[in-house]
Amino acid sequence: VRGVPDSVKRLTLADESLIFDAVAQQTVDLVRSYISADGTGRVAIIAPDDMVKPLRRHVYEQLRETLSAKEFDRLDAQSSWDEQVTVCSTQMVKGLEYDAVMVVQPGIIEENAPSRIVAAADLYVAMTRPTQRLLIVRTNADEKLLKL
């Protein structure tokens, strides 16, 4: 995030049962702010490996319910290499930039890494991908795992 006022936001939730809905709603807000129908704008939701698939389903269900059918169909039809909305692990975003990035449960990302050096590299990659907005979404328990 390059000198944009209010570019880093944090959302801390009471428990894990709230994560999926919160991430889905925050994604809708980011899509409305950063994604254009002309194909410009990119948003990444970076999560622990075991959360990626179920989180992607939940996010896309929320997008389907919230966006116009035309806009949802346009986003849903995009190939994985050119998606405007990506739900992925840290490994998938290396070397890429996004207008907005949401990092979900960074403490778990760190905890699941095979070593401390890999954990540090993964979190560095995740948190340096956005050009305009970084949003960290986590639970109170995750915050105890890793202070940011």
Regions picked out by a protein language model, each given a short descriptive name:
Residues 2, 16-28, 32-135, 140-148:
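Core RecA-like ATPase module of SF1/SF2 helicases and allied nucleic-acid translocases
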Residues 4-9, 13:
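ASCE P-loop NTPase motor cores of helicases and related translocases
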